[in-house]
Regions:
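Solvent-exposed, charged helical/coil patches
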Residues: 157-166
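ATP-binding pocket architecture of kinase catalytic cores
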Residues: 2-145
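Phosphate/dinucleotide-binding and metal-coordinating scaffold of catalytic cores
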Residues: 161, 174, 251-254
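Hydrophobic alpha-helical segments that form the core
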Residues: 272-280
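Active-site Asp-x-Gly
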Residues: 139-151, 200-206, 213, 217-269, ...
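A mid-sequence, solvent-exposed acidic-amphipathic segment
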Residues: 168-225
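A general structural signal marking secondary-structure boundaries and capping sites
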Residues: 25-28, 71-78, 162, 183, ...
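ATP/Mg2+ or Mg2+-diphosphate-binding catalytic cores
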Residues: 124, 282-302
Length: 302
């Protein structure tokens, strides 16, 4: 078997990918296929080299339906890591906060962003210190809203003063405040909501977490997920991420997904909102070329 070996000596990088691949693979029947993990160590992993083919409308539709079932496999809460993984995750060179317990609504209110303060969310190198103990305010019996989570964990950490000027950060802050108010909250797709109603341990979708189109490999056997940043999240974020850089037969994927697991009304108007996280990540990693898009999204929803 022709293989690919990925190596990274930085703490937790390989472990996060290994855990994410295994977690997504648990849902791969009837969920989306996931690249097999052949072997791994603390700083490396091996996968088969996938054969790439041109996607077809049929393959796109099959992928849309399968992705709906992956999401419906569920996660305990927003920001949940793959089971067994400790610490924060990564999207490319950017840190990704993972919540090992659900943030309760009352505690989330006490820790609201208020201002999108500057922070260093990019990789500071292998010798940088990291928080040793979890924030005790990250637990409560009443789970916070999606908007509060999205503002605090997925937008604010990347609104740093190296990338954004003061006026731009102020606009992003307004978006964060509106998200925290709850007016932009919305439900998960139907299969995820059904799973939440059936299982008290499911509170969010099981998401790939970095589902730009390059992380979908089209093979002779159909679409295969690679390079996840797996987490508990909102299913619409995966769907929105597919469109950030364009995706073959995107409308076919959406239609098949929506047939298998109907999306909540107004989902098309929320695509850009759910793209804000991946755009902010790209700004943190690659600089100001992504700022105009982030500012446009903030202005639209703030």
């Amino acid at each position: 078997v022709d293989t690919i070996r990925k190596a990274d000596s930085r703490r937790g990088r390989i472990a996060y990918e290994v855990a994410g691949l295994a977690w997504l693979a648990e849902a791969s029947d009837p969920g989306a296929a996931v690249v097999p993990l052949l072997d791994h160590g603390a700083t490396w992993l091996e996968e088969p080299r996938l054969v790439s083919v041109a996607p077809t409308p049929l393959a796109a539709e099959e992928f849309g339906r399968a992705l709906a079932h992956t999401h419906a496999a569920g996660a305990t809460h927003l920001g949940a890591p793959p089971p067994g993984f400790e610490g924060d995750g990564w999207m490319g060179e950017a840190r990704l906060s993972l919540l090992h317990e659900a943030m309760g609504a009352a505690n989330a209110n006490a820790h609201r962003v208020g201002r999108c303060q500057s922070s260093d969310a990019t990789d500071p190198g292998p010798h940088a210190s990291r928080e040793a103990t979890p924030d005790p305010a990250r637990a409560s019996s009443s789970e916070e809203s999606w908007g509060a989570f999205y503002a605090r964990e997925r937008i604010a950490p990347y609104a740093d003063d190296r990338t954004f000027v003061a006026a731009e950060r102020t606009l992003i802050d307004k978006l964060c405040e509106r998200l925290e108010s709850g007016v932009l909250d919305h439900g998960q797709p139907r299969l995820v909501e059904d799973a939440k109603n059936r299982h008290n341990r499911i509170g969010a979708a099981r998401t790939h977490g970095d589902l730009w189109s390059g992380n979908v490999m089209w093979t002779p056997d159909g679409a295969v997920l690679i390079d996840p940043a797996a987490q508990g999240g909102h299913a619409e974020e995966d769907l929105a991420a597919l469109a950030v850089f364009g995706c073959p037969y995107y409308e076919r994927i959406l239609a098949a997904y929506n047939e298998a697991s109907p999306l909540e009304d107004g989902w098309r108007e929320r695509v850009a909102l759910h793209q804000m996280h991946i755009i902010m990540i790209h700004g943190a990693i690659f600089g100001r070329s992504y700022v105009p898009e982030a500012v446009a999204i903030a202005r639209r929803y703030a």
